[in-house]
Amino acid sequence: MKQLKHTIRKAGEKPRYQYDCRKPPLHDINDIRHMLPHRPPFLLVDRIFHRDATDVAGIKNVTMNEPFFVGHFPEEPVMPGVLIVEAMAQCSGILVLGDVPDPENYSTYFMKIDGVKFKRKVVPGDTLQFEIHLMEPIRRGVAVVEAKAFVGETLACEAVLMAQVVKNKNNK
């Protein structure tokens, strides 16, 4: 029985959505800049290629030109895990704000991060694929998502994220 559970869990750790670089993205970087307040070098999502009411999938092409590789680590560059979690959170923001008519007037703020596991190093040349699933309906502006980041078919990071959606104060 234990072996069966392990096999089922392993099968569930492959990406559910397949990115095809030959197809235009659902949202390109310009759309993403409209939806999120983040800007380079802290905008960590390049494309969204799937989105529905409960799921979003996107990618980040990790290049040697990323500013964090200057110090993390110069001889063996590795993407900081906290930035992988942030990238998953940014994808979550796109899921949560995706159907809001004026997403630029809202922000999402972390409330809680649970069960973060880093399973593989992310290095220059990797393409991170994010898959975010809304675990329950958004209530009182609070969203809870299951977030996963893959490199190829290998799970690199997973976490459960909770965030609050807040209308920006400078907007009426």
Where do the protein language model's features map onto the residues?
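Intrinsic-disorder/low-complexity, polar/charged segments enriched in Ser/Thr/Lys/Arg/Asp/Glu/Gln
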Residues: 43, 53-57, 127-129, 144, ...
